[in-house]
Curated annotation (Swiss-Prot):
Compartment(s) where it occurs, according to its Swiss-Prot or TrEMBL record: Secreted
Protein name: Thermolysin
GO CC aspect terms: extracellular region
Top-level lineage group: Bacteria
Maturation-removed propeptide residues: 29-232
Species, as recorded: Bacillus thermoproteolyticus
Catalytic activity of the protein: Preferential cleavage: Xaa-|-Leu > Xaa-|-Phe
Length: 548
């Protein structure tokens, strides 16, 4: 969730982040192209791209890339370089594929491409292929540092500049060897993940040059997801009753085994809610009660965390046919009463964590259904587009969580509105919220691309610039006139379907606002047809916020 105080961070690779829509050397009259400004290569292509009878969907992609090698500035063997990571058929008749670009078997950081094939025709290619890696002398020398040396460099910097003490790591120190590209420079590098809860929660990603040990990039990606181990109680499924943070009564699924536990066995591999008991050790104790009635004030945050996790699960299952955040029914864990007076909620990489607030800035954060759904949507994003939590890709990441947090609030019909966190933020100030999707400028966030934040605070403006996309989403749903551009609203349901398809099938880790526009337009085209009002409204909304 966004705090009013922003965090400092470095900028993401400019070459991956810089994209723009230009009428630049169109590949064919039937193709629509969004170009990467830095590389002057295609970033998003749609149309009837290639049809070869008797060819597999992935082979169409390889042939298309090689056929257009000069446009992509990509002169390597596509089949050897593009590693197929995912392939599935969707309910619209498309074969969807996700590829990871590699260089001599080494993954290129953030370089993911998705493609769509229908009726034997390649119809879309989304994502930036990093060009001319075969000409980079810096990649030919080989690595000189070990994984341990890279981790030591990252930890030393973390302690010196972030934590001021050696933290207790929650999930070890994961390290991956990659090719990292920043503008025209390419480096062999280690990606080091440092995940911890004390002295303050963090999930830092360091990019360390594997030759000279230089820190190439670093940022806090607290909402990145990895499944955690869950120990369940063997018992009888029951239904309890309790009262939430705002005093509303609700039924909750529990499990009986001597005590009644906040363990919901009816959804996927379970929903589990824990009591952190004001400590910072997770997950804490699985919440237990003697009589299956949760009406004590201490129970309220647990009641809401448990109930709203279930509502979020139901939304994704019933509306988008998605089973939990990973699409494979992963268990959902939540811990409440984290630390003392803690003014935040976050996904720590494997579970939800909720502070109780200090009573002035926040009340217990699990009391906001949009807060719960926002954070769980970060996990959905990590398992699909994998949007890097920095600069424009990070702002899209935040906006996606705001959009679906709001849509879950409407789905539950829980006093729904287009504000974020209004139920738990500043209880002494009526009508206040963290962000507004209908009017981002109300809280100082930009509502037009010309007003975007371009500094390094807030991971390059991930919460700030999300306002631009939030406003576009609001206009797509509700309609209106913004900066002189009129938008015809198409409703929340269609907004959700368009953005869910864009998130899960077209966006890639380094997507920027231009690619999001192209992805949303293509998703609307897939769902409703190229001449539909839905496509027109998506274009109008992005025009209204200055995203081309």
């Amino acid at each position: 969730m966004k705090m009013k105080m922003k965090l400092a961070s470095f900028g993401l690779a400019a070459g991956l982040a810089a994209q723009v829509f230009l009428p630049y050397n169109a590949l064919a009259s039937t193709e629509h192209v969004t170009w990467n400004q830095q590389f002057q290569t295609p970033q998003f292509i749609s149309g009837d791209l290639l049809k070869v009878n008797g060819t597999s969907p992935e082979e169409l992609v390889y042939q298309y890339v090689e056929k257009n090698e000069n446009k992509f500035k990509f002169h390597e063997n596509a089949k050897d370089t593009l590693q197929l990571k995912e392939k599935k058929n969707d309910n619209l008749g498309f074969t969807f594929m996700r590829f990871q670009q590699t260089y001599k078997g080494i993954p290129v950081f953030g370089a993911v491409v998705t493609s769509h094939v229908k009726d034997g025709t390649l119809t879309a290619l989304s994502g930036t292929l990093i060009p001319n890696l075969d000409t980079k002398g810096s990649l030919k020398s080989g690595k000189k540092l070990s994984e341990k040396q890279a981790r030591d460099i990252a930890e030393k910097d973390l302690v010196a500049n972030v934590t001021k003490e050696v933290p207790e790591y929650e999930q070890g120190k994961d390290t991956e060897f990659v090719v990292y590209v920043n503008g025209d420079e390419a480096s062999l590098a280690y990606v080091v993940n440092l995940n911890f809860l004390t002295p303050e929660p963090g999930n830092w990603l360091y990019i360390i040059d594997a030759v000279d040990g230089k820190i190439l990039n670093k940022f806090n990606q607290l909402d990145a997801a990895k499944p955690g181990d869950v120990k369940s109680i063997t018992g009888t499924s029951t239904v309890g009753v309790g009262r939430g943070v705002l005093g509303d009564q609700k039924n909750i699924n529990t499990t009986y085994s001597t005590y009644y536990y906040l363990q919901d066995n009816t959804r996927g591999n379970g929903i589990f809610t824990y009591d952190a008991k004001y400590r910072t050790t997770l997950p804490g104790s699985l919440w237990a009660d003697a009589d299956n009635q949760f009406f004590a004030s201490y129970d309220a945050p647990a009641v809401d965390a448990h109930y709203y996790a279930g509502v979020t699960y139901d939304y994704y299952k019933n509306v988008h046919n998605r089973l939990s955040y990973d699409g494979n029914n992963a268990a959902i864990r939540s811990s409440v009463h984290y630390s003392q007076g803690y003014n935040n909620a976050f996904w720590n990489g494997s579970q939800m964590v909720y502070g109780d607030g200090d009573g002035q800035t926040f009340i217990p954060l699990s009391g906001g259904i949009d807060v719960v759904a926002h954070e769980l949507t970060h996990a959905v994003t990590d398992y699909t587009a994998g949007l890097i939590y920095q600069n424009e890709s990070g702002a899209i990441n935040e906006a996606i969580s705001d959009i679906f947090g709001t849509l879950v609030e409407f789905y539950a019909n829980k006093n729904p509105d287009w504000e974020i966190g209004e139920d738990v933020y500043t209880p002494g100030i009526s009508g206040d919220s963290l962000r507004s999707m209908s009017d981002p400028a109300k809280y100082g966030d930009p509502d037009h691309y010309s007003k975007r934040y371009t500094g390094t605070q807030d991971n390059g403006g991930v919460h700030i610039n999300s306002g631009i996309i939030n406003k576009a989403a609001y206009l797509i749903s509700q309609g209106g006139t913004h900066y002189g551009v009129s938008v015809v609203g198409i409703g929340r349901d269609k907004l959700g379907k368009i953005f869910y398809r864009a998130l899960t099938q077209y966006l890639t880790p380094t997507s920027n606002f231009s690619q999001l526009r192209a992805a949303a337009v293509q998703s609307a085209t897939d769902l409703y047809g190229s001449t539909s009002q839905e496509v027109a409204s998506v274009k109008q909304a992005f025009d209204a916020v200055g995203v081309k």
